Amino acid sequence: MIKRKLFSELIDHLPQKEMSLIFGPRQAGKTALMEMPKTHLDQRGERTLFLNLDIEWDRPHFESQAAFLKKIELELGRKRGYVFIDEIQRKDDAGLFLKGVFDLKSPYKFILSGSGIFAQLYRQIQPRTMLCHQSQFEQNHQNRPNNYLLFAFS
């Protein structure tokens, strides 16, 4: 696997409080990109949690902001931790849900990925975002020519 430039940018952004967003079409490598910094953090002994809205047993934790934060606190404690959420577009009103969680100023860093209507989430938080596109080199070395990923900071 090509080590993506986005991986370096994502690692550089991990110390920042803002959410990190990764989005693009299906099968573009979003989950693989998210797993790279998680592995990096796990190897450093950091607290991490990976939730996937495609997985049935992860979904109940997204029924309310309180349930979501309780799950995170049970897994990571009340200290700094990293929460990876894959397929966030499956959450109804994901933008409002996440904005509310972010506004609570919890000690957790959120790294999110999604596709499709996930672009609507980006538009909801766009005033606080910056985009970094997948490099042309990486696009040229993909098996599927039309793949792209966007990485945004909220």
Predicted regions and their residues:
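Phosphate-binding site recognition
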Residues: 1-154
